[in-house]
Amino acid sequence: MSPLTPNPFYNLYTEDNLKKPIPNTMLRVAMSVLAVMILWPMAPGARSWAGELVPIPLPPPQTDGGKPLMQALGLRATSRAFAPDPIPAQTLSNLLWAAWGINRPADGKRTAPSARNWQEIDLMVVRADGTFHYDAAANRLRPVAAGDHRALTGVQPFVKDAPLTLLLVADTSRMKGAEKDPDQRQWIWADAGFISQNIYLFCASEGLATGVRALVDRPALAKALGLKEHQIILLSQSVGRPVASIPDNPNKK
């Protein structure tokens, strides 16, 4: 706008105008815009207005139902093919609780055992919209890193197809006393195995496909997620809907 061009907003800010009440229409529009900005629900993995990942609250886990234990054991299997369909929030909440949730709130103990109750295993959720840490106490996902890092969670091609991979990471800084006895570090593998089996049994009960692996590009994945030296990637386990089986060709000889 040149100096000679009249400013269309000049007269709005005169002393007289500032004393006038705001027209009802303008007030309603302003309040509506503000309400939308505050209350608009963000989709899982959505970014904040500043462009950063935000914590994702999970629905309360449903801890009843499911198949009988012996039936789930009979259905437990490893899969290497996954449909790309996203896992619903309720199913994800149930899965995470079954894997490593708090089943005794009074003392914070979990659904899987932990040597000396170190609770040194962190369960991370790797998805297309980012990587998140399962905060069992708050029942939410805390952002770890933006971006799709599923391809780094294994060396097989299928790892990038599953809608999510659960990453089991040991935080050795919680293992008080283990620094005096290095053999106690071996417990991290047992503790991770307990959680992995919980994941298997939940998936068997819910008709989901899952597969665990230890073959992971640990240095690349740790760098991508910004992990510290005391955080050790142990296992990764993909979860998703099973791929529908293709019926045999009746004309096949």
Which residue ranges define each predicted feature?
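Small-aliphatic-rich amphipathic alpha-helix that forms the alpha element of a beta-alpha
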Residues: 76, 95, 123, 164-175, ...
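N-terminal secretory signal peptides that target proteins for export/translocation
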Residues: 1-26
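Signal peptide processing junction and immediate N-terminal pro/mature segment
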Residues: 42-50
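Short, electropositive alpha-helical surface patch
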Residues: 220-236
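N-terminal amphipathic, basic helical "cap/leader" segment at the start of enzyme domains
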Residues: 5-11, 49-162, 247-248
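Bacterial N-terminal signal peptides
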Residues: 29-42
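C-terminal helix-cap and adjacent tail motif
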Residues: 60-62, 232-253
